Structures are given as C-alpha cells and as structure tokens.
Amino acid sequence: MKKFISSALALTLIASVLAGCSSNTASTSDPGSAPESSTPSSQVESNIQEEQTNTEKALALIGTFASGDTETARELLDENYIQHNLAYGTGEDAFIGSVEYLASADGKTTVENIRSFEDGDYVFLQTVYNFAGAGEQVAFDIFRFDEDGEIAEHWDNLAALAAEPNPSGHTQIDGTMEVTDLDKTEENRELVKNFLYDVMQGNNPDKTADYFDGDTYIQHNTAIADGVSGLNAALTALAEQGIQMIYDETHLILAQGNFVL
C-alpha cells in the first residue's frame, strides 16, 4: 500500500526551558524484636526511575514548572544537563533555578501536555505552557536521555497560542493524538526523510505529488489552509514577498508509529 504524508504540526521557533531537598524518616522496632531491614532512599529513587518510561520522566520534569518540585527535577536530570534554549543557562542548577523562579512568581504557571512519543533515547512532547501567567505558548520539546535513564539534553521551539484557528478551522494542537501503527515506524521515518530531501530541500520537486494522497493534507500552521493546494498557495505568496523557506540539512528524524518529527 502506498504511504502518504497526511498531516503537519507547524510551529514557529523561539524558546522555553525552565527545577533539592530530601527528607528521611526513621522507624524504631519494639525492644527484643529483630530490626527491620530498610532500603536506602537513593536505591528507592533508582527503582522509581527504572519503573518509569522515558516519556513519563519527561512529563514529570515539565510538570515541575507548575509544581515547583525541585527535588523531582533534580532526581530526573543529569548533573551535566545540556540546554540548547539560548534564553536559559545550561546545567542542572540552571534548570532548578528556573523552577524556583516560577514557584516564587506572582503569576501561576500551567502545563498541559497535548501529545508525546519516544524514539530510543529521545522523547518528543507537544505542550501548552503558561509561564508565570505571561500567556499561553505551544511548545515542541525534545529530551535526550543518557545511559543511566537521566535527562541529559534538551531542545525546544515555542510559539504563542493563536486566538483563532487557521483558514481551514484547525488549531496548533487539535488532530490525532494516539500513537498507532508501531510496526510502520521505520517505513514512516523513511517516507519523511525522502520527502525532506526531495521536496523541502528542493532536490526533486517534481516528486511532490508522490508524497500526498491527492489534495488530502491537514495543516496546523496558523496561516495556511488544508491541502497541498493550500501549502502551494502559501509558498507562492511568500515567494512574491521575497521570502523563501529553506531547508539546508536534516539533523535528526524522530519517529514512533504514525508520528514523525
């Protein structure tokens, strides 16, 4: 069966990233009874980490923006955490500082995850943030995990949540959310890889129609209508203004089932 690209989640680039203490309780046994064995707290934390999927860990980390839970953030982060958001410092302490700042801010921070998937050591999240009441933003977050299951690196893009839907009535966050077709992950990854090379990088533009099922194409860009025709119209309008959309290099393609980024 021929595979087609059917949907696009398009957002504008910008930025976001914003995370200890621990308490132990001791118990005593009755005189004469054998002392009860206990598990060190560090081992308990390790066991909890191992029981969570990487997606669950990533969701727990972004949740600390709203909860102010610096202890959880520190447990999840590698101490040499690398931050690629140019507005924030790199390292575990910088992340913790951001969480502490949000917790002390007058405005409330909210975090609403919309969709997620994971690919090996990487987790992708699409989330609506409102940092300290400054306004809702839609974000793409990518987290990389190290060999110990800790979050070691982060990239993100943010755009303001549009007040109105696009010309076809779609928003930045509606559409398919469930991850399906896990057996087609690599097939879908290859499809998008070839699409980027042939069409977006301009190597074989005549193949554009091969990647779509006629004019069926759901668009989530705030300014572009559905369909290949809608995309072509938008690109033509940009070209008339002297604006080009240029893809020089594909650095990373993440995929799980029916989602590819």
Question: What are these regions, as identified by a protein language model?
Answer:
Residues 1-4:
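Positively charged n-region of N-terminal signal peptides that target proteins for export
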Residues 7-13:
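Sec-dependent N-terminal signal peptides
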Residues 16-20:
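C-terminal motif of bacterial Sec signal peptides marking the signal peptidase cleavage site
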Residues 22-24, 30-261:
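C-terminal and inter-domain tail/linker signature
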